[in-house]
Amino acid sequence: MLEYDTRNDDENIISGNSATHVMTSPVQLDLNPDTSYDVLNDVFNLTATDIAVVAPTDEIMAQFGLDDPFAEVDFDIVGGNFKLLIGNEYVDSDGKVLGRYCYADGINMIYMFNTDTIPWATVMPLDISMTMITSTYIYSISSIDVATADSSTHFELNGDSSDFQVKCSDGDVTADNFKSFYQFILRAPAEELYLEETDAPADITITITHQSGTDKIEFIKSDDRKTIIRLNGRTSFKCRTAYTSRLIENLGHLLNGENMVDTW
């Protein structure tokens, strides 16, 4: 599910993303404004290549795969609701798939649409989303807590680009080095979806308190050289464990006044 990003309406909230909408299901994730454009906007230029059937019966709807559709597209737009059922594929004389049969709710016809005009039939969540789990602007953050099995570190953030300051519970850190550390947090990669719930304790927990609330990112080591990522209580992604290993190392670099390592 994609929903309008209400952060756009709050002048006090600065987001690190320019997309107008966010993904709320199956996971919470910012959209990539470029790759999500067609999914959000093609409904306004939807043009069929042909009409297959006028006034189809229930039996005909079933024949075209529209009684149990391959996909359903539901848009809440200005002026009302638009619903499109996407059914079976149709092919040319050589068996090449050209598109799918579709039915627009309220218009009693079965249409034929080329595949490239109905992106909703093929899109996957990570195709249109940002790979970053969070894009919270650093100057809108009041605190960040990083907890591991061995330690807990609290950072207080104040100021904007002209007077940014950081206070750390474990000693002095420079503003520039902390910015580099936060950039590494932002790069936490949503490399694959993982929706299976787990009650395993987190190996690393990052809590970000900002103008519009709190985000909690938990990293839970798996048994396949990957790490489960739980975002705000929802198991959502997996990433390579190499990232979390480097994250712990970079926390040490930050506290020791050393440069971050960007690769993993």
Q: Residue ranges of each PLM-predicted region?
A:
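Secondary-structure "cap/kink" motif recognition
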Residues: 1-264
